[in-house]
Every structure is written in C-alpha cells, then in structure tokens.
Amino acid sequence: MVSAPPHGMNRYRASVSYDGGSFHGFAENPDVETVAGKLRESLEKIIGHEIHLTCAGRTDAGVHAEGQVISFDAETFDIEKIERSLNKLCAPFITVRDLQKTNDLFNARFSATCRTYRYRILNDDYPDPFSHRFAWYIQTQLDIDSMQRAAQAVVGEHDFSSFCRKATILVDGKEEEASLIREVISITVKDEGPFVEIWVTATSFCHQMVRSIVGTLVAIGKGRLNKSDVSSIISKKDRNSAGPVAPPQGLTLMEVGY
C-alpha cells in the first residue's frame, strides 16, 4: 500500500543511469557497495536527514540501467542544486536526471505499469574490449530469425517458473512461494550488427526472468533447441528445462512506464 509523505515532507522522483558492473546490485547490502547504498548515502550527506529509497526494479549485480526510476521523501530543497551535488558525489558510475517533486502517492515501484529491458549480445568473429562490460560475447553465428520467431511464445500472461528463481513471501507471518505469473507485453530480437539486441517489455519481472529467456533464445540461435520448444518449456514450469541464465553484463533496464 502506498502512503503519503510524513508531515513537512515532499515526495520526489528521479531517473537514474548506472554502470552495474561497478556495484553489487541495486538493493542495499551493508557488506558491499550497491547503487541504492551510494544514492542514499549521497542524498543524506547533501540533504542532512535520513532517506528511504524506492526503485522501479532491483537490478542484480552487473546489470545496468539507463532508465531506472527512484522515489523518496524529503524536506523542501533546491532541486537544481541538489541534482548537481548528487551527480558530483555519484560520478562516474551513476547519473541522476530529471529530479522533480511529484504527487504524494507516487511510488517508483507500485505506480509503474511496465518495464523495458534490453539485452545486448556481441555476435562477431572477435571480442571487443570496449563493449565487454555491456554485452555478452558469442562467436557462434546466431540464427536471429529463429530467435525472433521463438521469442513470441513468451508474449502474454504465463507462469514463468521455468525462467525464474523461486521466491517466497510472508503471508500472515508464514513463508509462502511467491507467484511467478507475469505478463510479457512484447519481445523483439533485433539484428544491430555486430550486436544482437533482445528487447522485452512486461508489467513486471521475476528474478532472472529476462536473462533466462535470453539464455534459452541463444540456445535456439545456436541450434541446440528448436524454436518450437519455448511453449513446452513454459508449460513444464521446471527451471531445468530452460536454457542457461545469460550473464548479467548484457542486460540494461531501459525504461519504466507510468
């Protein structure tokens, strides 16, 4: 449930880009440096009071973002000044844009209607030292047409147990398995030679869902699975039936819809 800011506070939102290879994921972890930890510490240093951050999607270690969205409550401040100061403290691996006051019931996570991720593969004869942090290098020539055809089987509402890590939630104080039913709005496999880009938009994602779908599509692109196999993989609801999880560096959270 989304609540309004405490008395004397305003709600703010911002877009955030980051190089995920420099952090151990987005979510705070006291033992390692994370995106949320760096942002919160920087905001608290500038603003002078405790901050609680909410994000649209908690990316894993090594996963990047161009269009992550955060929200938080704070006392009134000079937006332009705070944004400049924040970018100085967070550079060079995090950039904050479009910091603005928003409505009291906005929540970066729960107000979102969809998220779009891009997965980038370098499909070339030679690796590229300038893209290795942001793409999965695969030398074997991929059958992009078969990958695109196969990908359409994931569109719609499905139980994505075959493509996600199991998770639990607390219900009345007891742990229960979380639902892995999700709705994929669109998926496209693009030839952007020498890169192959896989764009996926869904209302929400479960853990490792995009990377598992990509790993399966790559197996199809290499001829190790048939393009007709995706539907049966979904219906099995068995993680072992899908392809391997693609490495994190090729994945970027591109946009969040509201």
Predicted regions and their residues:
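Structured-RNA-binding interfaces characteristic of tRNA pseudouridine synthases
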Residues: V2-Y258
